[in-house]
Amino acid sequence: MNLLVTGAAGFIGSRYVHHLLEATRRGREPAPVITVLDKLTYAGVLGNVPDDPAVTFVRGDIADAPLVDSLMAEADQVVHFAAETHVDRSITSPGTFVRTNVLGTQVLLDAALRHGVGPFVHVSTDEVYGSIEHGSWPEHQPLCPNSPYSASKASSDLLALSYHRTHGLDVRVTRCSNNYGPHQFPEKIVPLFVTNLLDGLRVPLYGDGLNVREWLHVDDHCLGVDLVRTQGRPGEVYHIGGGTELTNRDLTGLLLDAFGVGWDVVDPVADRKGHDRRYALDCAKAADELGYRPRRDFAEGIARTIDWYRDNRAWWEPLKKRPAGPAAPPRGSGP
């Protein structure tokens, strides 16, 4: 089986490829032949991609139709992680998010349709729903995105599902809660705070810090995505959550305690525009249909994540110096 994985030099995509290889080594899955397509933007790290004979890396843009067509011609299935994901950057540069997240997804869908490739697993986010005060969202909740990032992801979700409804393409959509774990680019809250605290620096906290997020270890996310790929139904949406809800203030307190420092290192900053107050996913469908359950205890997972960043300065220190530019240097010419 030939599997095309987009965005697999990034945080979640690379962990997914590792997940597949580990499942193969343990005999849980037949060995796939994996092609990774990644543009290597500022957040892409070629070293994240496993150095394995089963994995081929192709540097390229998902919006490059001829390239995508040539790769899709050799593929049996697709798992699509590639996306611009940072909310703050989407507010200042929305065009980049529309081009990659919407137009890039369209290019992939067109090529998959031409070559009869499926399933096409489209990986998305809980942010497409907006904000929920109480309870949790089911998969049929109407989308109400509040940032250019989440609007671009909502658009790509709807586009992907339309290819199933219009053309019969085997599209399956996953929507996850906030991820954390090793190899996460240090612009996101957990690695930003952890690396700042390791360096004795201050950490920023938006607004009153009472925005609530549900936390999901990246390995549990990868487990859920692969269950959808192998057992999910065409045209369906599945939620993949971690089950641990924390305010940003609570999360900050946990990280401060882990480093033995007080709140005097926290800088309150003005709240982000359109900052969603609370996210929460109802994951009963994935549990009932696929047997999905998160396996990682949050306290253990966050402790191991801190240890990983403490032990891997050589990975994250160069990344914190990178400008948020169009692309990182290729292998051999950079960190």
From Swiss-Prot:
It catalyses: dTDP-alpha-D-glucose = dTDP-4-dehydro-6-deoxy-alpha-D-glucose + H2O. GO terms for molecular function: dTDP-glucose 4,6-dehydratase activity; oxidoreductase activity. PROSITE patterns: ADH_SHORT. GO terms for biological process: antibiotic biosynthetic process; nucleotide-sugar metabolic process. It comes from the Bacteria. Its EC number is 4.2.1.46. Keywords: Antibiotic biosynthesis, Lyase, NAD. SUPFAM superfamilies: NAD(P)-binding Rossmann-fold domains. Binds 1 NAD(+) per subunit. Signal peptide: none annotated. NAD(+) binds at residues 11-12, 38-41, 61-62, 81-85, 100, 149-153, 179. The active site is at 126 (proton donor), 127 (proton acceptor), 149 (proton acceptor). Pfam families: GDP_Man_Dehyd. Pathway: Antibiotic biosynthesis. Disulfide bonds: none annotated. Substrate binds at residues 85, 125, 178, 188-189, 204-206, 213, 248, 271-275. Its cofactor is NAD(+). Involved in the biosynthesis of the two 2,6-deoxysugars, dTDP-L-oleandrose and dTDP-D-desosamine, attached to the macrolactone ring oleandolide to produce the aglycone antibiotic oleandomycin. Catalyzes the dehydration of dTDP-D-glucose to form dTDP-6-deoxy-D-xylo-4-hexulose via a three-step process involving oxidation, dehydration and reduction. Belongs to the NAD(P)-dependent epimerase/dehydratase family. dTDP-glucose dehydratase subfamily. This is dTDP-glucose 4,6-dehydratase. The gene is oleE.
